[in-house]
Design a protein with these regions (language model features):
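Amphipathic alpha-helical segments of tetratricopeptide repeats
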Residues: 97-101, 137-143, 176-183, 216-224, ...
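"A position-specific structural signal for the A-helix of alpha-solenoid helical repeats
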Residues: 7, 111-122, 154-158, 194, ...
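Alpha-helical adaptor scaffolds
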Residues: 152-229
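Short alpha-helical DNA-recognition segment
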Residues: 15-33
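Short, charged recognition helix plus adjacent turn
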Residues: 63-90, 261
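Helix-turn-helix repeat elements of alpha-solenoid scaffolds
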Residues: 84-97, 126-136, 165-177, 206-217, ...
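A short, Lys/Arg-rich alpha-helix, primarily the initiator
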Residues: 1-14
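DNA major-groove recognition helix of helix-turn-helix/homeodomain DNA-binding modules
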Residues: 45-60
Length: 286
């Protein structure tokens, strides 16, 4: 990743915007100049004010700064999906754990955490839990990053099975209170919506109805656009499960069956089968 200040200066100068214009009159030119030279940081609020003044979106800046260029997540998920089995994921997990112990690269530790989340999400019968060290590492990593890009959003979304419902809600509240949240929503809406949907499912499966209502409201406040038909359908299933668990079984069951029918019509076979299995298990437990 390139120096953020240097990238900012490159964009500002290429657009013939002066230091004074870039501050928008909200802070001093000297403060911005020191930031560009890497001598000090800007507060998040001032950084995003300056970003708006140089007419640059968060996604554009993230791309130019290389914030997402070194993401190992696509490679990791490819390894995971190549041979989806508990044994394969456990072996991958051990290999990344060993690599971290040997080289102390944070990417290896994060990869092992993501794999643990995958194992927990796909194989709930396995006795496995996130350690306090892993949860602390995730929190420190995510909330010490000044500019979130697709990598941070993907990391938070993928690791949802590791958290309790209350903790995931707490972290989501911190996310939506970030000063860059509106910019994140504009540039990475699908990733944000996946975070909300994962939180909704997590709260529902934990029977934490207050948390589920919190995520339900978030989803409705930032509802999926029509071109996000898959997420709309999964949300329909989640809403049905929420109602079913709260005792409104008839309408809840109807919504879940509707969602599965839509997935089947769209030929989303794996997803349809996944939610059919989930529905059977839910009915058998009740």
């Amino acid at each position: 990743m390139k120096e953020i200040g240097a990238v900012f200066r490159q964009i500002r100068e290429s657009r013939h915007i002066s230091l004074e214009e870039a501050t928008g009159g909200e802070f001093s030119r000297s403060m911005l100049s020191r930031f560009e030279r890497g001598e000090n940081d800007l507060t998040t609020q001032r950084f995003f004010q300056a970003l708006q003044q140089i007419k640059t979106s968060l996604s554009e800046f993230s791309h130019l700064a290389g914030i997402d260029q070194h993401s190992f997540i696509p490679k990791l998920l490819k390894e995971h999906y190549e041979n989806m089995s508990l044994e394969h994921d456990q072996a991958l997990y051990q290999s990344y754990q060993q690599a971290y112990q040997k080289y102390q690269k944070k990417e290896d530790f994060l990869a092992s955490i993501i794999l643990k989340a995958k194992i927990l999400g796909l194989y709930p019968e396995v006795e496995l839990a996130a350690s306090q060290e892993e949860l602390d590492f995730l929190y420190d990593y995510l909330f010490s990053v000044m500019v979130w890009g697709n990598f941070e959003l993907s990391l938070f979304s993928l690791t949802s099975p590791l958290f309790s419902s209350q903790l995931y809600r707490q972290y989501t509240e911190e996310l939506v209170q970030r000063e860059d949240f509106k910019l994140l929503l504009d540039s990475s809406r699908p990733a944000i919506n996946s975070i909300f949907l994962n939180g909704f499912f997590l709260a529902i499966s934990s029977n934490e109805f207050e948390d589920a209502s919190f995520f339900d409201h978030l989803i409705n406040d930032h509802f999926y656009s029509e071109n996000e038909a898959y997420l709309r359908t999964v949300y329909l299933y989640a809403k049905g499960e929420f109602l079913y668990r709260k005792g409104e079984k008839e309408i809840g069951l109807e919504k879940m069956e509707q969602a599965i029918q839509v997935l089947s019509i769209l030929d989303c076979k794996d997803s349809a089968n996944y939610y059919k299995q989930g529905l059977r298990e839910l009915i058998n437990k009740s």
